[in-house]
């Protein structure tokens, strides 16, 4: 315990700091939290990298999208270091035409500025675009920008209960998004 705090003292100190940044770019920035808490956050993520898993039916979904010549972008608020770790563990990188993090644009996906910069960068066909996310705020932002199909992932982790996000199509796994079911 680097700061000699009890668990409850640490929670009382950390939670208000975290809540103040929720939904902002800093919320997702490893460098920011490393500076604030004087901890090697990237190493802490590395230490739990064995918990990183590919969601059920993601590979089948991506295979079908590729087979139909769809452009596929991973668009995330995660810090570039976090994405590099996840790609190293999952080997998913080759499925994507590009991996874009909100840090590339200096604004989180919750903000309309992100979507405008994304559109400038990859020339979105908004009406034909499909976007998946597990954050209600991000989904609302994508919908407001005009993304044609916005889908809520209601079970983003096997470790948490299903949570329905009102106002959106909800899926628990990508099996529900595969147009032709694998045999």
Per-range role (PLM):
Residues 1-60, 68, 79-81:
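N-terminal helical cap/lid subdomain that shapes the substrate entry/recognition surface
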Residues 5-7, 39-41, 72, 94, ...:
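Residue-level detector of short coil/turn "hinge" positions at structural boundaries
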Residues 20, 45-48, 70, 105, ...:
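A general structural-boundary detector
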Residues 66-73:
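Short, conserved structural micro-motifs that define repeat-unit consensus positions
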Residues 63, 79-80, 84-183:
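Asp-based, Mg2+/Mn2+-dependent phosphohydrolase catalytic module
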């Amino acid at each position: 315990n680097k700061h000699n705090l009890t668990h409850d003292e640490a929670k009382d100190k950390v939670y208000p700091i975290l809540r103040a940044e929720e939904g902002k770019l800093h919320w997702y920035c490893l460098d920011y939290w490393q500076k604030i808490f004087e901890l090697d956050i990237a190493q802490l993520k590395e230490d739990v990298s064995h918990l990183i898993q590919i969601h059920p039916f993601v590979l089948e979904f991506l295979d079908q999208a590729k087979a139909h010549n769809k452009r596929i972008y991973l668009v995330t608020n995660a810090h570039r270091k976090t994405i590099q770790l996840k790609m190293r563990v999952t080997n998913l990188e080759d499925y994507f035409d590009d991996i874009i993090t909100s840090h590339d644009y200096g604004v989180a996906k919750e903000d309309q500025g992100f979507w405008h910069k994304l559109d400038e960068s990859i020339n979105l066909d908004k009406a034909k675009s499909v976007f998946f996310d597990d954050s209600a705020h991000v989904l609302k932002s994508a919908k407001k920008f005009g993304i044609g199909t916005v889908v809520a992932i209601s079970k983003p982790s096997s470790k948490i209960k299903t949570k329905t996000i009102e106002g959106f199509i909800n899926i628990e796994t990508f099996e529900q998004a595969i147009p032709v079911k694998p045999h």
